[in-house]
Regions:
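Short, Lys/Arg-rich flexible segments
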Residues: 1-96, 102-161
Length: 161
């Protein structure tokens, strides 16, 4: 008769660590928030969302980078059950989702164009999504796998020797 004894102490230790990591998700959520920021920074750098290029702007130059304030305002937060990314800039939503800006307090919006000025009643801003999710909460192409990799790496910390 053949008898094999298996020392599964390493397996038991690893599974125990995995369970401990899963029961304390704050580090994983912090890592996910950091990855959301990294994806957003990639979007600004590549002027695209999930590989889809943003519409060009009329002034030329880097898109959504006239002053750099929008990109600099991106911040994250995380806790035991959430990872969040956002900005406090009042003009952020119009760039993320697009829309029409209309003159409110005066009859016209005024824009400097070259050496002169242009007056219009409204201007259509195309969507140039920079955050890695849509209005409906859908992640951009490639983001889901990046976030899953981060989550799995964080859960596996301390499991392998």
């Amino acid at each position: 008769m053949l008898e094999i004894s298996l020392d599964d102490s390493d397996l038991q230790r690893g599974l125990g660590q995995l369970l401990r990591n899963a029961s304390h998700p704050r580090p994983m959520m912090r890592a996910i928030a950091a990855e959301l920021l990294s994806i957003t920074e990639d979007n600004f750098a590549h002027e695209s969302w999930g590989g889809r290029k943003w519409p060009a702007n009329a002034r030329g130059g880097k898109i959504l980078q006239k002053s750099g304030q929008l990109a600099a305002s991106i911040h994250t937060a995380s806790g035991s059950n959430f990872a969040r990314i956002g900005t406090n800039k009042p003009y952020a939503a119009i760039h993320q989702f697009g829309g029409t800006v209309k003159a409110k307090n005066k009859p016209y919006l005024v824009f400097k164009v070259g050496d002169g000025f242009r007056r219009v009643k409204q201007v259509k801003i195309p969507a140039r999504p920079y955050l890695p999710m849509s209005k409906g909460g859908t992640l951009q192409a490639g983001a889901e796998s990046r976030l899953l990799d981060v989550a799995l790496d964080t859960l596996a910390r301390g499991v392998r020797k």
